[in-house]
Amino acid sequence: MATTTTVDDAQPPTLQNILDQKSLKWIFCGGKGGVGKTTTSCSLAIQLAKVRESVLLISTDPAHNLSDAFGQKFGREAVKVNGFSNLSAMEIDPTSSMQEMIEQSEQRGGALAPFMQDLAFAIPGVDEAMGFAEIMKLVKSMEYSVVVFDTAPTGHTLRFLSFPSVLEKALTKFSSFGKSLGPMFQQFQSMMGGGANAQEDMFAKLEGMRQVITEVNSQFKDETKTTFVCVCIAEFLSLYETERLIQELTQYGIDTHAIVCNQLLYPPPGSQCEHCRVRKAMQDKYVHEMMDLYAEDFNVVKIPLLTEEVRGPEKLSSLSEYLMHPYQPPQ
């Protein structure tokens, strides 16, 4: 029989410990689609900017909602967020880097580029994995004190976190293949009149990315450097996805000890709204389940459903306070 977690047993319902843990370098926010991942990651980045020297917020979700959230256009270059001196943001497509690298090789005279493309994309997930490597290489060169990732919906998030091991294996084979057939490539390249070093450069770049991935992989599995914030709403499917996410993160060896539950209803006392009453009863059921499952080991943060859309730095800053100071429902 499941035991009920008491208030005394429960972890503090805030993300204060993430702000206090100055050794953290990588923070991921993820969960099912439509649960408020972007709002949560933006809010957390705003709070981190109060205690860290420099914060970078990255969207790896193809939908790219950071621009909408802040009301400011972001792209592939890190740009300061309006109103903040030490918070930057960028939106990148993890699938674009491999194709760009092949195109660069072709432009430099790589007659074997079509062959290289077929070979590269024959490795499952390598296009996204190469994008991931490019992202991490870029981010590491920027030297921000902490990086917050606004990830894609759960399935994409888990694949994103598996890229280091996928890419490490793939690039080991790819580099080995390149070294074995390198002389043949050069001879054929000379016959075709192309640049002799194009493929060598490509292999060198792949090898460099493999080294970056190996280092990042070890950092992701270091709880002093990396943590994952699970974002959900009080519904069955979202709770189910959260449990699956936590289990898979545990399998990857990635620390997770925080859950943010968004869009909670708190009708004012005496409210005659039948829809609100029924909806709140359903939410309460899943919140109780969540607390029983996680409150002893996780910081479970409850965020209210607001009456207006959260867009722009001011509203995000206001919402971010709920991550540090528990919301007090009307009595």
UniProtKB/Swiss-Prot annotation:
GO terms for biological process: tail-anchored membrane protein insertion into ER membrane. The gene is GET3. HAMAP family: Asna1_Get3 (MF_03112). GO terms for molecular function: ATP binding; ATP hydrolysis activity; metal ion binding. It is an enzyme of class 3 (hydrolase). It is found in: Cytoplasm; Endoplasmic reticulum. Zn(2+) binds at C273, C276. It comes from the Eukaryota. ATP binds at K32, G33, G34, V35, G36, K37, T38, T39, E235, N262. The keyword Transmembrane helix does not apply. Belongs to the arsA ATPase family. GO terms for cellular component: GET complex. Its EC number is 3.6.-.-. Keywords: ATP-binding, Cytoplasm, Endoplasmic reticulum, Hydrolase, Metal-binding, Nucleotide-binding, Transport, Zinc. ATPase required for the post-translational delivery of tail-anchored (TA) proteins to the endoplasmic reticulum. Recognizes and selectively binds the transmembrane domain of TA proteins in the cytosol. This complex then targets to the endoplasmic reticulum by membrane-bound receptors, where the tail-anchored protein is released for insertion. This process is regulated by ATP binding and hydrolysis. ATP binding drives the homodimer towards the closed dimer state, facilitating recognition of newly synthesized TA membrane proteins. ATP hydrolysis is required for insertion. Its main location: cytoplasm. Homodimer. The active site is at D61. This is ATPase GET3. It comes from Malassezia globosa (strain ATCC MYA-4612 / CBS 7966) (Dandruff-associated fungus). InterPro entries: Anion-transp_ATPase-like_dom, ATPase_ArsA/GET3, ATPase_ArsA/GET3_euk, P-loop_NTPase.
